[in-house]
Amino acid sequence: MARKETVEAVKKALASRPKRNFSESVDLAINLKNIDMSQPKNRVDEDIILPSGLGKTIKVAVFAKGEVAVNAEKAGADYVFPPEEIEKLGADKPRAKKLASEVNFFIAETAYMPTIGKRLGTVLGPRGKMPAPLPPQADVTALITRQKKSIKIRSKDRLTFHATIGTETMTPEEIAENIDAIIKRLETKLEKGKQNIHAIYVKTTMGPAVKVM
């Protein structure tokens, strides 16, 4: 169950949003402090499962063949690419960039990771979308299911960064549960935990920011 303070902040953000003809996303602005972000080890780069989901489709692509590819399709992967497609994507950078923008998470059988790094690393790497490796005998269905409820939060070298954590069609309680899950992970990840968090705000796409903590 979400904290009361988080639920109230979400309610305020939703109530103060301007009326639009489209469903707005709900975003989180995270401000850190007392961290040297020039050191890669201090940067935030986390995949976080949202207990309430994102409220919209999270797309997953899988590089696999044979039974793994079949299971990936059954599990709801949005794209399943055979290994020979890696070379084709690497040779067609506009297509690769479009795919990287559209897909939230990539998965690849471990045997194909070196080729993906060589052919697609310059496209996927900077976007934080290098595939999660799938070892032999691993359950691709479980991984896809998990990623379909996850988001990636990345600070890069900045103390302030943003993440989409829901949509306005979700209940305040659902959005608040997602926020609290992110805060909990941040407090675990950061060297000094809560002391490294300066402030966190929630807002809709076009609405004003409301302080969560």
Curated annotation (Swiss-Prot):
Record GO terms (molecular function): rRNA binding; structural constituent of ribosome; tRNA binding
Keyword Repressor: yes
Record keyword rRNA-binding present: yes
UniProt GO BP: regulation of translation; translation
GO CC term (a single one): large ribosomal subunit
Keyword vocabulary terms for this entry: Repressor, Ribonucleoprotein, Ribosomal protein, RNA-binding, rRNA-binding, Translation regulation, tRNA-binding
Lineage top rank: taxon: Archaea
SUPFAM superfamilies: Ribosomal protein L1
The protein's assembly and partners: Part of the 50S ribosomal subunit.
Family to which this protein belongs: Belongs to the universal ribosomal protein uL1 family.
Role description: Binds directly to 23S rRNA. Probably involved in E site tRNA release.
The protein's name: Large ribosomal subunit protein uL1
Organism, scientific name: Methanocella arvoryzae (strain DSM 22066 / NBRC 105507 / MRE50)
Lineage: Archaea, Methanobacteriati, Methanobacteriota, Stenosarchaea group, Methanomicrobia
Gene that this polypeptide is encoded by: rpl1
